């Protein structure tokens, strides 16, 4: 930490705000430690924050995760004002999920309350939180993906153009998105047409604390009223119509449970987790689990269940494995790709391989090579062509997958892994494999 942050940091620590936020589980804790090398003259403190098991990004969150992060941000502002402080920004990238809920990880996001100044994070909050939540709730939940394109938040004029006309009846959305976008356009026009480079830009009017509090409360009310209910999609209902009889399902669950107890991993990634049944088996084995699925309804149901049951070892995430989050931002160095964030000890890939290899035409050796980048140990289920689910996939297309056999699967995966164990799942034609990555 440089000396330019000294006054605000000292205020955070002396005002009692830090203790309140940490005690309520709203902020990661930190320790002040000795600097690792000779500090510069600008050095003030070296902080060692509590570590986050998995760093996620807003475009990987389900609706309720983004909503909870938005409500946390507004709660942080309210608590900060009670301690004569304020948030300097409202970036969702300052929020991570820890022990089942959102927390702020940026200790330096707080400053001494700037008397009379408008709430500076207002635009950022509307672009990063209110606009995507409104679009997901009022138009289409898949519009969350715009956050992957617009790293600085969804432009408000774009959000306004995408929202249905009936949203004009919603006062909060009309004010904070449509009128806000119109003000931005007029502000930019005024700034660009003023004569001379030194012409004064339009000045914001002073805003009292009461007015800032009212603004924050109005945003909070707007966010709380936005909702999205996961409908019965193909994937959300997948487990109720899977290929397993009760005995087969229990055998598969038992095999997965036994493997995980034997492996005792610290972190597990469950790819294609659906609503998280096997993620919870991994969590019961003591692992911290990241539970990925491409279906917004599955991720939403998974998160709601985890939140309801206070499952603090489980983190649901929205991710399309055949189009995973890439490295983004300047020089591809601001947001890491999924593979760059891989810290799992074990990857679960259950009832998944046929969707990747057949539905998406990904060669088996390529699947194996990518999974080997994610973890040293793999627990994967092979689903043969004779399985009803694969028959359904092939019913409307030509079978151009001659190597999609058990022998072809093993040959492809042995290029990247050593097959340690293969167990036929009782009452089915599926096989569960335990594999270890080759050196």
Identify the residue ranges that each predicted region occupies.
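Catalytic activation segment of kinase domains across protein kinase-like and atypical kinase folds
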Residues: 86, 91-139
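Conserved SAM-binding motif I beta-strand of class I
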Residues: 288-293
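A conserved beta-strand element that flanks and buttresses the S-adenosyl-L-methionine
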Residues: 348
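A short, conserved alpha-helix within the catalytic core of class I
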Residues: 355-371
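Conserved beta-strand signature within the Rossmann-like core of class I S-adenosyl-L-methionine
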Residues: 370-385
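Conserved class I S-adenosyl-L-methionine
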Residues: 264-274
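Conserved SAM-binding loop of SAM-dependent methyltransferases across substrates and taxa
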Residues: 275-287
């Amino acid at each position: 930490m440089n000396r330019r942050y000294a006054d605000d940091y000292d205020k955070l620590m002396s005002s009692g705000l830090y203790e309140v936020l940490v005690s309520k589980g709203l902020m990661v804790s930190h320790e002040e430690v000795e600097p690792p090398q000779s500090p510069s003259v600008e050095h003030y403190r070296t902080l060692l924050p509590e570590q986050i098991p998995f760093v996620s990004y807003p475009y990987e969150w389900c609706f309720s995760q983004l909503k909870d992060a938005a409500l946390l941000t507004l709660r942080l502002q309210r608590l900060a004002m009670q301690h004569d402080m304020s948030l300097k920004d409202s970036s969702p990238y300052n929020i991570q999920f820890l022990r089942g809920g959102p927390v702020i990880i940026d200790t330096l996001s707080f400053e001494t309350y700037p008397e009379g100044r408008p709430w500076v994070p207002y635009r950022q909050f509307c672009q990063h939180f209110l606009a995507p939540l409104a679009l997901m709730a009022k138009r289409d939940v898949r519009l969350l993906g715009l956050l992957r394109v617009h790293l600085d938040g969804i432009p408000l004029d774009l959000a306004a153009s995408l929202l249905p006309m009936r949203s004009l009846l919603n006062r909060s959305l009309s004010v904070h998105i449509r009128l806000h976008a119109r003000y931005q356009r007029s502000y930019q026009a005024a700034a660009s047409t003023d004569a001379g480079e030194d012409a004064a830009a339009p000045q914001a009017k002073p805003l009292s604390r009461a007015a800032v509090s009212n603004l924050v409360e109005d945003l909070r009310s707007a966010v709380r009223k936005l909702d999205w209910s996961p409908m019965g999609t193909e994937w959300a209902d997948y487990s109720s119509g899977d290929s397993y009889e009760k005995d087969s399902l229990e055998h598969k669950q038992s095999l997965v449970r036994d493997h995980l107890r034997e492996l005792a991993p610290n972190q597990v990634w469950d790819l294609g987790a659906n609503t998280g049944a096997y993620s919870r088996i991994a969590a019961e084995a003591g692992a911290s689990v990241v539970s990925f699925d491409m279906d917004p309804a599955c991720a939403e149901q998974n998160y709601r269940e985890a939140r309801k049951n206070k499952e603090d070892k489980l983190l649901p995430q929205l991710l399309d494995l055949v189009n995973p989050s890439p490295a983004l931002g300047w020089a591809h160095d601001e947001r890491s790709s999924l593979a760059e964030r891989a810290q799992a000890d074990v990857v679960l890939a259950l009832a998944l391989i046929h969707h990747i290899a057949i539905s998406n035409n990904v060669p088996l050796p390529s699947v194996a090579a990518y999974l080997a980048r994610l973890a040293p140990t793999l627990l994967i289920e092979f689903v043969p062509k004779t399985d009803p689910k694969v028959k359904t996939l092939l019913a409307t297309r030509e079978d151009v997958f001659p190597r999609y056999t058990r022998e072809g699967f093993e040959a492809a995966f042995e290029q990247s892994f050593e097959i340690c164990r293969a167990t036929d799942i009782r009452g089915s034609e599926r096989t569960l494999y335990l594999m270890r990555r080759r050196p």
